[in-house]
């Protein structure tokens, strides 16, 4: 048996989803029958599972803002380890760039606007005659705020035995998934105690076997924010 698990937090506010549904009366337009269904948070899993893959397996979602992918990875891993399913397609999808959502991010004062980008370029001794938007996001560096983007990510997760059985190309292993809430903190962009607990749990489980020369990929979240 298989399972699909994915979600989106912001995309449903787009024109084809909840955004279009809420705007239709104001714009003197007729609401589409698809507006309501496409506004559901789990549609990135349900639609693909049923109408693209044609699967009759389980489908669901767990949403957790920027950690949505990992919540769904954790759900799939738990089901596989309990022998309830053999494999799962998991992921997340977001397309938040529209006027209303952008206004919401600007209201947090955490987004990189023209004034902040110019100030950052000046701090780096760069020309301030023009804004270099290609360098607005600088991972692990001196940044000026969040840069909005749109993306989706999906992965097929199986047990080791099932992957070998079907001859799948194994790209990585998922021995553990650790997720903790931030806890109380001063701002949404600052790290919370939960972040430190998560990293401590993750590193403590494989640090004894850690070899920096063998690490080919490290993905960190929020590196281009502040």
Locate each region found by the language model.
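Single conserved hydrophobic/aromatic residue that forms the stacking wall/gate
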Residues: 1-7, 11
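Beta-strand segments within the central parallel beta-sheet cores of soluble alpha/beta enzyme folds
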Residues: 5, 59-63, 85-93, 169-178, ...
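Conserved small-residue
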Residues: 8, 48, 69, 76, ...
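Active-site-proximal gating segment of KS-fold condensing enzymes and close homologs
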Residues: 9-59, 102, 106-127
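Short acidic, glycine/serine/threonine-rich loops at helix termini
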Residues: 15-18, 73, 98-104, 185-188
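Active-site-proximal alpha-helical scaffold in enzymes
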Residues: 41-45, 49-52, 59-94, 146-168
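Condensing-enzyme catalytic core mediating Claisen C-C bond formation in acyl metabolism
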Residues: 117-217
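Extended C-terminal subregions enriched in glycine
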Residues: 224-226
